[in-house]
Amino acid sequence: MKRTALAATVVLAFAVPAQAQDKLELKVAEFVGPQHFMTQWLVKWGEKLEKASNGRLAFKHFPGAAMAPAPAHYDLARTGQADMAWFLHGGTPGRFPLTELINLPYMVGSAEIGTKVLNDAGLRAKFLDAEHKGVKVLLLFTHQPGNVHTTKKPIKAADDMKGLRIRFAAPTIRDFVAALGGTPVGVPPTEQVEQLQKGGIDGTFIDYGGAGIAFKMGGVIKYSTEMYSYVTSFGLAMNPETYARLPAELRKLVDESVRGVEKEVGEGWDALDAIGKKALVDAGAQAIRLSKEEDARFRKTGEKVTEAKIKELEGKGLPAKATYEAMKSLSEKHSKGSRSFWTDR
């Protein structure tokens, strides 16, 4: 409640006087349904902006991939089909190679930490913003660390992944699945349930919130192995021409509305973990905790994947090592005082 009040205060502090101008209705594309925390956060965020602008700004939301499938959301904002879009970096593999280093196995322990890392001004200016061509990035964020969920075979050890067809959430997790002996399969988020039901995949890497709430996998998932091994990164992008058309005072209002929200957004995602887990377990799924020995084996494989990815990107002339080291340093910094699923469940 206090965080919501604070966010409202920040927006209202930059409220603009009413002027005799037409209302500007902005289209916002979201690939997850209206029941999800982030979709609801965006709706409330828009309502605050509408109030702070004295009605000069309005927002029309298109949740549930109503405008286009998830992989197309970045381009919806880039081309102006949408004025704003919540997009998934992993939806277009290879397009954001440095940003996606945040998705490496065991990089961050919570959405709060991940969101704080990605919005560090120095990191963005030096490495990340240049990858987001053709849009104005309003906010970068992650979900809480994800797990592997399967339909038939429980995964209790690193060797249990061998031979299974597993949907990956990002290119880095594709490499993780392959290193564990599984077959990585690319499936858009909205098609996971269908592929799980048909047997096209044996399991999927996804966070509890996504599995239990956003994509309603209760009854389909039989086993959830709590690895908390990775986060998926997202962004809120705005069409630059739409932004440029706004009067200066409205541009300022938009800019200020997303400053200092990292903790609020991150904690909101982290809170989905318990809710999503309950939805799956209530529908019959078994939650599996790894032994310390098996957790260490998964982490060792993750280290090898990380080393290989950095070497691969450095070979392409990208500053992967410097980006990774900056992210890791920020992750350690923000771990002090933030929740981590590796230690706090």
Regions from the PLM with identified roles:
Residues 7-8, 18:
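Cleavable N-terminal signal peptides
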Residues 10, 21-114, 122-345:
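N-terminal secretory/targeting leader peptides
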Residues 14-20:
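Sec/Tat signal peptide C-region and signal peptidase I cleavage site
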